[in-house]
């Protein structure tokens, strides 16, 4: 089902089952396709990953004092990008099968991967606070009714001075919801909520921005047409700082 301009909820259990099946398709030859899709286009996955990191990394200020919370870490794609010596990295994902892969791929002693639902994230951190939060492609799977609560919970884990990096697929025009929509590309039913840029900024205004953050930068991630191969959606990023 494709719903354009309408609000509808998606099923978390179906999304979790989708990613469980994605984990079964993990291929060391094309590891990032598990969460970036494009199973048959390794070159596109590689180039999108390279370009995303090239654009976003300079905004993150990663160094020895960095304490990173990677929300929806998947198999640890962004953990791979962090080559500096840092203080702490916590990667969380609601799919335990993806977390298992992340733990096998990354053995650095101060990098930790956990499986937990987003509504439990604050209590799972054992009092840890973070100065960098990565939210890469997660809001698209969160229903409206839970979104503000999730964002406020993540804000509560931020240090006084912190950066939040949000990279999301968003609707180029009006909201698009895919609900149990069969994808020929993925060979599976898919659920996602592609919000407009204005909707996301509205969610930030009542959460992060209300707690002292400001939007330091926001724009479309890819300018290249071959990296934007969707007509109704595109990748967009927001850099929030406090």
Regions found by a protein language model. Name each.
Residues 134:
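A conserved beta-strand element that flanks and buttresses the S-adenosyl-L-methionine
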């Amino acid at each position: 089902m494709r719903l354009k301009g309408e609000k509808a909820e998606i099923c978390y259990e179906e999304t979790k089952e989708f990613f469980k099946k994605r984990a079964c398709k993990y291929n060391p030859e094309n590891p990032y396709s598990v969460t970036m899709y494009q199973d048959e286009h390794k070159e596109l996955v590689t180039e999108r990953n390279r370009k995303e990191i090239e654009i976003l990394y300079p905004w993150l200020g990663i160094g020895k004092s960095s304490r990173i919370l990677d929300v929806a870490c998947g198999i640890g794609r962004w953990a791979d990008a962090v080559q500096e010596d840092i203080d702490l990295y916590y990667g969380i994902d609601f799919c335990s099968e993806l977390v298992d892969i992340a733990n096998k791929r990354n053995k650095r002693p101060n990098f930790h991967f956990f499986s937990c639902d987003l509504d439990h994230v604050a209590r799972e951190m054992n009092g840890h606070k973070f100065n960098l939060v990565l939210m890469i492609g997660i809001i698209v799977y969160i229903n409206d009714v839970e979104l503000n609560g999730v964002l406020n919970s993540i804000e509560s884990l931020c240090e006084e001075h912190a950066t939040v990096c949000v990279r999301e697929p968003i609707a180029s025009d009006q909201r698009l919801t895919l609900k149990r929509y069969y994808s020929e590309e993925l060979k599976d039913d898919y659920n996602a909520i592609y919000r407009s840029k204005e909707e996301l900024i509205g969610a930030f205004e009542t959460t992060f921005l209300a707690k002292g953050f400001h939007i330091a930068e926001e724009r479309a991630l890819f300018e290249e047409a071959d990296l934007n191969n969707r007509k109704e959606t595109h990748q967009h990023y927001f850099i929030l700082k406090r």
